[in-house]
Structure formats: C-alpha cells, structure tokens
From Swiss-Prot:
Record family assignment: Belongs to the UPF0415 family.
InterPro entries: DUF1308, DUF5614
Protein name per its UniProtKB record: UPF0415 protein C7orf25 homolog
Top-level lineage group: Eukaryota
Amino acid sequence: MSAYSMLSERIAMAKELIKRAESLSRSKKGGIEGGAKLCSKLKSELKFLQKIESGKVAIKESHLQSTNLTHLKAIVESAENLEEVVSVLRVFGYTDSLGEKQTLVVDVVANGGHTWVKAIGRKAEALHNIWLGRGQYGDKSIIEQAEDFLQASRQQPVQYSNPHIVFAFYNSVSSPMADKLKDMGISVRGDIVAVNSLLNHPEEYLLSESESDDEGQELLQVTRVDLDNVLARVAFPTEIKVDVCRRVNLDITTLITYVSAMSYGGCHFIFKEKVLTEQAEQERKERVLPQLEAFMKDKELFACESAVKDFQSILDTLGGPGERERAAVLIKRINVVPDQPSERALKLVASSKINSRSLTIFGTGDTLKAITMTANSGFVRAANNQGVKFSVFIHQPRALTESKEALAVPLPKARTNDSAH
C-alpha cells in the first residue's frame, strides 16, 4: 500500500472513530466520564493527519503507523463491547510497592465500575519482545503494567470488592504472556497466538544477564511469535462475576423517600412550598420508589440508631397517617444497629455539608461494609473532596407530603392523566 493510500485510510478511520466516540458519549444519560477527552484525542490525530495531507507536514511512514490511533481505536471498540460503561481514560491515583504516589490511566471503566479494561493496539511481536527484554530502553512490558493495575485496583475497591481487570488485545498476544496474565488473575481478550523456539537463533536474540529477569530466563529466551498459529480467540467475558454487596445501609433521606406519600401517587399537586412542587414534578417524570425497591431486593437492610431515631422524630412532626403506617412496616424489615462510624469517616473535617449526623450514618455503613442509600449527594461529594469515597446508591429526594396535600392545589385531570404513573 502506498503512503498516500495509507494516509487516506487513516483519515477515514479517524473520522469514523470520532463518530463512534461521540455516539458512545451520548449512549448514557448524562454522558460517559472522559468521553469528551477521548473525542478530543481523536480530533487531534485527525488534525495531524490532515496537516500531512495538505503538505504542511512531511509524510513519513512512522506517522501513518500512529500507535495513538491504533490505541484509541482499541479503546472505542472495547467501550462498544462492554456493559454499563461509566468512564474512559480515567485516571486513578495509587501508592506503589515502594510507597511512591503514582497515577494509572484505565482505558475503559465498565460494569458500573467493577471492571477495568486496558485496551492494547500494539502488535503481539512487539509486546512479546519487550517482555523478553528486546524492546527499547524504558519500554514497560505488559506484565509490569499488569502489576501496576493490580496494585492500583486493590486501592480502589468498588462496593468493597476490587475491580476485575481485563487486558484487551486487538493485535494478538503471545500464549506465554496470556498464560502469565491469567496466572496473575487478569482476564485476556483477543487472539492468543503460539510462539516458536528459534533453534538457529542469531546472537541479537540472546539476552544478557543484566538485561533479563529470572522470569524471562525461565521462559525460553529465544522465541518468536507465530501469528499464523492462533491458539484461541477470546471475546470479552459476557458476564464478569462480581461480588455483589448484599448489605444496604439506609440514610434518613432514603427512609423518608421510601414512605413519602409523593412516592405512592401523591405527586399530582402544586404545593405551597416550591421545593415540594419541584419534587412532585420530578416524580411525575421518573418514579423513585421502583428504583429503591429494585436496589433493595434480596439485600439485608441496616440502619443505625441515630438514623432511625431522627427519622421517627421527623415522622412524628411532619408525617401523615399513611406515611407513619408505611414507616412502621419498613422499620420491621431493617436491622437497627448501634452507631459505629468507621475510622476514616471520623477523620473527616466538619463543614457545611459534613455534619456529625451524616458522618455517623455513612461511617456506620462503612463499618458494616454496606452500600449506603441516600439522597444526600452533597455529603458524598464533600467527603470525596477530602479523599474519603463511600460506597453509595444515590437517588432523588422526596419529602413527607401527606399532611401538606390539604393545602396544595390538585393538578387538572388532563395533566394528571398525561403524567400518570
């Protein structure tokens, strides 16, 4: 293929990838974190290729074999093939084995955060050679990168379990490397190809003692990837087993939302309080109760004593008869436990968003290793800003409204029917 036809092909590929990346970003309500960054990187690649096309930059084969574009294509393809993608090109901070602060870029975070994917576009030969010490100085082997991923994932638990790591190879991977990754607990996606021993090996394939590690020595130093001999074609795991957390800690905001008259059809009013009218409008558009029930299904429910006590106090003051009745039924389903905030929760500095009550509730959930259900997103963000990330399920709030209905204006029948649940 001539350089110019290769250039045209690359430009077409970049344009197509931009469309696919933009489509990916739109596929999730609220967008995918990092989607704009991915599109921006692709547009930069396209701009550079167009400069070559216009003659502003001299044409070189190395430019056309851009590893950036290959890598970005691998990211797009990975994201398209995974469920519940939450972010792309996500940067995580972690501490390495020497105690140094490091950062790691995860190409695709999927499965609601439970799966980390590294998308690899480089050819199997290059990856295999780097592993065996035949790469350029400073090249980090895939196995070394896998160790970084494992180290970082242990420090970024999602709902109290470490993310599962998948290395997705789009230009094959050698069988020994795939085996090593699997031994490390990493899933492999892509074509797994054989390697052949070189019986009449030239001198340059031999590794000096200083260049190789024990692992490399052990593993046939003189091997060559055989791309024609595909041993296995491995697709993305369709169902990655995730240790689903079965414990749920209920915040006061969730207890109130769960029993609110508004959650049971009482949303067809214009209330005197603007905030209640806004909540009613939100409820007509999107019901909250089915979301809460779906998340709570088959899980053990907990609430700390402070949460239940304050909930009862609010209920006694503002609750209507139906809301109190539903609350009595709900409390019977809950394991009420003593307040026991975790150490890391107690280290939080008080602020307008972080008060002792929230700290106790979320901290108790942390001690229980439970996911805290809450409408208090302000606390979650404030804690996150202080470096404490709680496992949470965030939903929209609903206030106790049964006693307010008498003074509210019912919506006209037509509007009620249009937005009926």
